Amino acid sequence: MAKKSKIARDAQRRAVVARYAQRRAELKRIIAAPGSSPEERAAAQQELRRQPRDASATRLRNRDAVDGRPRGYFRKFGLSRVRLRQLAHSGELPGVTKSSW
């Protein structure tokens, strides 16, 4: 189980990313657009730099939905490898069967 403070910090970051996502995408579009003037591009870069660091999606960490474990994360299930194995063996994941060949 991950520390509660780490889980809470990640949840707070997810909220900040969601709040700024639309504006960040708009600024990035202006910066990347070949038709925007150098002044517009510089202004967009400046505003992007002024936004909080936690507004960037790269600062998020994928965590297990049950206990917050940060490593061994399976995107398809939203679980860590440990929790995935535990739930699969107990039959709580529909369609997941033990491999045999």
From Swiss-Prot:
Region (Disordered): 31-69
Entry keyword Calcium: no
Keywords: Ribonucleoprotein, Ribosomal protein, RNA-binding, rRNA-binding
Any one GO biological process: translation
Molecular function per GO: rRNA binding; structural constituent of ribosome
GO cellular component term, pick one: small ribosomal subunit
Stored Gene3D superfamilies: 1.10.287.1480
Biological role stated in the UniProt entry: Binds 16S rRNA, required for the assembly of 30S particles and may also be responsible for determining the conformation of the 16S rRNA at the A site.
Family, similarity comment: Belongs to the universal ribosomal protein uS14 family.
HAMAP family according to UniProt: Ribosomal_uS14_1
Protein name, entry field: Small ribosomal subunit protein uS14A
Origin species: Saccharopolyspora erythraea (strain ATCC 11635 / DSM 40517 / JCM 4748 / NBRC 13426 / NCIMB 8594 / NRRL 2338)
Lineage per the UniProt record: Bacteria, Bacillati, Actinomycetota, Actinomycetes, Pseudonocardiales
